[in-house]
Amino acid sequence: MEVSHPAVHPVAVPPVLTEPPARVRMKDYQGMPGTLGGLALRLGQLGFAVLSFSIMVSTPDFSQVTAFCYLVAATVLQTLWSSITAVVDIYALSVRRSLHHSLLVGLFAVGDGVTSTLTFAAACATAGITVLIDNDLDECGQNHCGRFEAAAAMAFLSWIMAAPSFLLAFWSFGNKIVCF
């Protein structure tokens, strides 16, 4: 009777990792909360809102028109929201955490939706009043139409940076809801 002898194959020792393995996050798209793209959008929103606010406040007679006061209020709100969410994004990136909790994603979606809508409405109102002053009343000589136009343009750019943040957060929140 012939019995086979088991062959012993030595197993190599796995290499020691000096760094943690790279994490793979399949559902993080750039622009969503907690990503570098999301942080870039937040900083863009913040920068353009601060510019719009600064330009509008630098004109001495902005407080006489309700639409201009509304733009100032909307840009202050946009600045506060963008600052807070940028800090949250920086924290999430620094500790390598994803922001996929449905309550947090819902808060981002609602906050982005409200602030982007307010900023867009304020920019439209400011642009409309500026067109009225410039084209219809022909009183740009005694008003600061250039500053008003620049403030409206910066508010539109802030809204353009806020819209993708809202759409991605809303889409992500919609994917988290389970329908029965």
UniProtKB/Swiss-Prot annotation:
GO cellular component term, pick one: plasma membrane
Disulfide links within the chain: none
Annotated membrane topology: Multi-pass membrane protein
Coiled-coil residue spans: none
Cell location: Cell membrane
Keywords: Cell membrane, Membrane, Transmembrane, Transmembrane helix
Main location: membrane
Chain ranges on the Cytoplasmic side, renumbered to this chain: 1-36, 89-102, 172-180
Record topology, Extracellular segments: 58-67, 124-150
Transmembrane domains' residue ranges: 37-57, 68-88, 103-123, 151-171
Oligomer status and interactors: Homodimer and heterodimers.
Family to which this protein belongs: Belongs to the Casparian strip membrane proteins (CASP) family.
Annotated protein name in UniProt: CASP-like protein 5A1
Biological source species: Pteridium aquilinum subsp. aquilinum
